[in-house]
Each structure stands twice: as structure tokens, then as C-alpha cells.
């Protein structure tokens, strides 16, 4: 099927009717909490993959959680340095939008990466709640079971999102008007295969798993508190807390899928806030609920401080 490249000008993309100061204030506020989330995610990745790798590498939950961390980090980087900055800083729109007036590979790669990460977030949610449920249902064989399943789960999280992204990959990805700036959209090459359809299927499937698995986990924790180790119990409560943030995403996605009149500016902002809570919240919740991660982070900071002081003392002694 042949396609003709679409060319847009900045006047058709940029809307001058939005208050610049108000839009900039929205970006400043969102960039602040997204930056906190990005710092927490990078810190977690450093602890899990580098500084305390021996402790976490054999824990199947943290292997699954790594995928969530990478996906969230991708989304946070995209939002801070591209998505939100060009949406909420309208004064940039006339200059920057000219670079994206025609479909480009760069824009397509960004859009695919962003939405791949969103699919991974939903899929990792499914596997994490399954992991916690199996921990309380079969504590004796849980480790052996997930040692076999985790590589398969990791492969699924990497590959399955492309089942919902293939239409983007063959379509024209363009800049589109969003508030006073611009965002990224696409012209469907295959009309029925919309991204929102595939995302809704994935999110609603994850919602079903989340409700069932979290309910079972919560119930069994009350019954088997003596048979579940404290660290596993802590991870169960972590998973339950992350699931609560996912419910916000599922709720807004379900509203968009079923209510055509709800697609207003306020609802779009509410959807962004729901995704932000899910993206930022997972790392913050993990730090708040996991004592070992907190101690690892603070101990590494203390080591750096001691190193700086020691080096300073050596330098002083040398010059004396």
C-alpha cells in the first residue's frame, strides 16, 4: 500500500490561544516530580544491577521489576526532555515543530520506544502480581518455579509489545497539535488496528490479573503470615501498593475507551497524572517498603562521603 508523506506547517500545529505562563508552570511542576522519579529509578537500577547485584540477582521479583524500571526510565526521559517540554512550553513550538513538519525516522523511533515502554509496564504488572500470588500459594516450590518462568517472562515482555506496535511501524508518525505546543501522533496505515485498541486490551488484561492476584495475595498473607518470610511479605505489600497506582491508569484508560464525550483537556491531564503516578510511584514505593534498598542507597552515599573526606585529608597531609 503506497503512502504520501504529509507535510505540516507550524501554524497548523501550534495553538497561540493558550496562556504561556500557565503552560510553563505546568511543565515546571511536572518536570520536578518526574525528575525525582527519574533519580529514584536510576538509583534503583544502580543498586540492583551494580552495587548490590549479588543480593538481588537470584530474586525473581526483582528480575521482573528490572523490566518495569527500564520501561519507567524510558518514559520519564521521554516526558522530561521531549514530550512535556514541547507540549507545555508553547514558545518553542514555532521553531522546533518545523523539524517535524514531515514524518521522520527519529520521530517514529521515539514514538515506538515510548509505547513499547507502556506495554512493558502493563506486562510487568501482570508478571509481578502473579509472582507475589505464587509466593503465598506455594511458598515451598516458589523459587524453583520462577527460576524456570522468569526467562520466559522476560522474553515475552520484550517481544509481545510489538503485537500492538506493528501498525505504528508501518504508518506515518507526525507532530500534532496538543494544547499550546505539539505532541506525536500517527496516521493509521491499517484503520482498524489503532494503538488505543491494543493498549486497552493490554491494560484491561493486566487489570483483571491485578484484581484477582492481589485479592488472593492479600487474603493468603493474612492466613499464612508465619510461613511467608518477612522479605517476601514486604515484597507482597510493595506489589499491592504498585497495583493501586496501576488501577488509576486502568481507570482513565477505561474512561477513554467507553466515553467519547470525556476526551477533554482536563481528562487528558488526568490521564497524564495517572500514568505519572504509576511511573514515578513504583520506584518510590519500592524505596519506602524495602529496608534493604534504603540501606543500600544510604550506605553508598556514606561511602562516597567518606571517600571524599579521606581524599581531602590525604591531599592536605601531602601539602603539609
UniProtKB/Swiss-Prot annotation:
Pfam families reported for this sequence: Srg
GO annotation (BP), single: sensory perception of chemical stimulus
Localization per Swiss-Prot or TrEMBL: Membrane
InterPro entries tied to this protein: 7TM_GPCR_serpentine_rcpt_Srg, Nematode_SR-like
Chief location category: membrane
Keywords: Membrane, Transmembrane, Transmembrane helix
Assigned protein family: Belongs to the nematode receptor-like protein srg family.
Protein name according to UniProt: Serpentine receptor class gamma-17
Species lineage: Eukaryota, Metazoa, Ecdysozoa, Nematoda, Chromadorea
Name of the gene encoding the protein in the UniProt record: srg-17
Amino acid at each position: 500500500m503506497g503512502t504520501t508523506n504529509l507535510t505540516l506547517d507550524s501554524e497548523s500545529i501550534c495553538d497561540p490561544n493558550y496562556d504561556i505562563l500557565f503552560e510553563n508552570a505546568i511543565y515546571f511542576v511536572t518536570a520536578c516530580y518526574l525528575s525525582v522519579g527519574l533519580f529514584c529509578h536510576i538509583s534503583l537500577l544502580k543498586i540492583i544491577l551494580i552495587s548490590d547485584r549479588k543480593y538481588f540477582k537470584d530474586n525473581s521479583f526483582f528480575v521482573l521489576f528490572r523490566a518495569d524500571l527500564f520501561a519507567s526510565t524510558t518514559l520519564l526521559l521521554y516526558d522530561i526532555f521531549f514530550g512535556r517540554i514541547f507540549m507545555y512550553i508553547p514558545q518553542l513550538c514555532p521553531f522546533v515543530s518545523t523539524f517535524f513538519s514531515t514524518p521522520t525516522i527519529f520521530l517514529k523511533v521515539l514514538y515506538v520506544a515510548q509505547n513499547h515502554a507502556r506495554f512493558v509496564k502493563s506486562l510487568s504488572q501482570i508478571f509481578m502480581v502473579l509472582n507475589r500470588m505464587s509466593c503465598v500459594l506455594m511458598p515451598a516450590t516458589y523459587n524453583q518455579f520462577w527460576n524456570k518462568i522468569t526467562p520466559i517472562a522476560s522474553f515475552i515482555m520484550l517481544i509481545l509489545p510489538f503485537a500492538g506496535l506493528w501498525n505504528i511501524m508501518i504508518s506515518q508518525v507526525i507532530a500534532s497539535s496538543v494544547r499550546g505546543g505539539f505532541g506525536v501522533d500517527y496516521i493509521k496505515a491499517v484503520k482498524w488496528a489503532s494503538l488505543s485498541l491494543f493498549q486497552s486490551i493490554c491494560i484491561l488484561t493486566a487489570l483483571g490479573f491485578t484484581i484477582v492476584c492481589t485479592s488472593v495475595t492479600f487474603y493468603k498473607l493474612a492466613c499464612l503470615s508465619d510461613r511467608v518470610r518477612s522479605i517476601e511479605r514486604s515484597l507482597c505489600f510493595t506489589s499491592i501498593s504498585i497495583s493501586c497506582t496501576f488501577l488509576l491508569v486502568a481507570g482513565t484508560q477505561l474512561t477513554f475507551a467507553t466515553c467519547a464525550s470525556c476526551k477533554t483537556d482536563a481528562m487528558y491531564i488526568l490521564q497524564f497524572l495517572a500514568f505519572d503516578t504509576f511511573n514515578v510511584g513504583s520506584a518510590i514505593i519500592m524505596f519506602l517498603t524495602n529496608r534493604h534498598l534504603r540501606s543500600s542507597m544510604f550506605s553508598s552515599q556514606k561511602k562516597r562521603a567518606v571517600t571524599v573526606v579521606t581524599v581531602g585529608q590525604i591531599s592536605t597531609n601531602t601539602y603539609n
